[in-house]
Amino acid sequence: MRERLLAAEKIKAIEWRDGTLHLLDQRLLPQEERWLSYDSASGVAGAIRDMVVRGAPAIGISAAYGVLLGARRRLAAGGDWRAALEEDFRVLAESRPTAVNLFWALDRMRERLARLKDGEDALVALEAEAVGIHESDREANLTMAQLGLELIRKHSGSPQALLTHCNTGALATGGFGTALGVIRAAWLEGLVDRVYADETRPWLQGARLTAWELAEEGIPVSLNADGAAAHLMKTKGITWVIVGADRITAEGDVANKIGTYQLAVVAMHHGVRFMVVAPSSTIDMSLHSGEDIPIEERDGRELLEIGGKRVAASVEAVNPVFDVTPADLIDAIVTERGVVERPNAAKMAELMSRKRLH
C-alpha cells in the first residue's frame, strides 16, 4: 500500500527549498494555484493566522520552519539571539490557538535548541529538526492510511459510501492526509463507491479543497451542503464518517472543524460509524476533557460577507471555527501509533505509552 500511495501522490502544500519556506496559498484554490515564499517567523505566523496554510499538521510543520527562519534572522542581527528568538516563539504560538500540533512543533524546536552543544551549528540543528518534523508527518500519514483502511475492511469488504468534513488531505498535512489519506487508501483497495464531502462553511474547505483533491485523483466525490449530512446518512447508505482532528484530549474528546460534533450525533442516530484520523502529535494528554480545549472564534465578517459584500444587514455573527465531539460518540481514533476503538482515558494512556510505528 505504501508504494501505491507514493505512486498516486499528486498534491503538496509545503516546500522547504533554498532556505525558504514555500506555501501553496489555500485561500485561492481551486481557482488559482499560487505559491508564496516566507523568510521570517512573523511572515509564517501571518500565513498561519490568515489561513494561507491550514490543517493542524501543516500548521505545526510551518511553525517549525518559522522558528528556523526566526533563528537565522536573530543570529544575523547579533547580540543575545536566543532571548530575541523568544519573541518569534510567542508570535507563532499566538497565530492559531486550537491546533495543538502548533504547540507540539514549537516545543520540539525549543527542546532541540536547549540540547545544542558547544560549537554546534544552531541553524544546521534546527533545520534538521524542522525537516524531521515534516518528514515524520508524511510517514505518519502513510501508516494511518493503512490502519484506517484495515478498520474499514474489517467491517465490510465491499465498495461503500463515505462522508468527510473540512479538508484533511495533502493540503492539510505533510503529505497524503489524515482522514483523506485513509479514504485514498480505501479507494485504491476498491472499498469506496463514493465520497460525500461537506462544503464546510464558512471557508468552504470541503468545497474548495477536498472536492478538488479527490477529483484530481479520480475518486468519485459529491459535494453537499453541511445541512444535508443527516439526510444523506439516511438515504445514501453511508457506512463511515471519517474526519481529522485539531486536538484530542486524554479522555478521547476531539476538537475539529465546526460541524463535526453534529455529524457525530447524527451518525450515532443512523448507525453510521465515526472515525477520527490524526497523528499522535494532535493528542494533548495535559487536557483532561474537551471542556478544557480553547475554541478559536474568528471574525464574524466571514459569515456576514460574501465576496466582500455584506449579505446580512444590521446583525451580529457568532463564528466559532471548532467544536468538541465527546469520546462516547467516536467509534475509533486512528493514529500512527495504533487504533483506539471506543476511546476512553485508559485506552488513550495506553496508546500514548507505545513507541511510534514508523
Curated annotation (Swiss-Prot):
Pathway: Amino-acid biosynthesis; L-methionine biosynthesis via salvage pathway; L-methionine from S-methyl-5-thio-alpha-D-ribose 1-phosphate: step 1/6. The record marks C166 as: Transition state stabilizer. It comes from the Bacteria. Keywords: Amino-acid biosynthesis, Isomerase, Methionine biosynthesis. It catalyses: 5-(methylsulfanyl)-alpha-D-ribose 1-phosphate = 5-(methylsulfanyl)-D-ribulose 1-phosphate. Belongs to the eIF-2B alpha/beta/delta subunits family. MtnA subfamily. The active site is at D246. Its EC number is 5.3.1.23. InterPro entries: IF-2B-related, IF-M1Pi, IF_2B-like_C, Initiation_fac_2B_a/b/d, M1Pi_N, NagB/RpiA_transferase-like. Catalyzes the interconversion of methylthioribose-1-phosphate (MTR-1-P) into methylthioribulose-1-phosphate (MTRu-1-P). One of its GO terms (molecular function) is S-methyl-5-thioribose-1-phosphate isomerase activity. This is Methylthioribose-1-phosphate isomerase. GO terms for biological process: L-methionine salvage from methylthioadenosine. It comes from Azotobacter vinelandii (strain DJ / ATCC BAA-1303). The gene is mtnA.
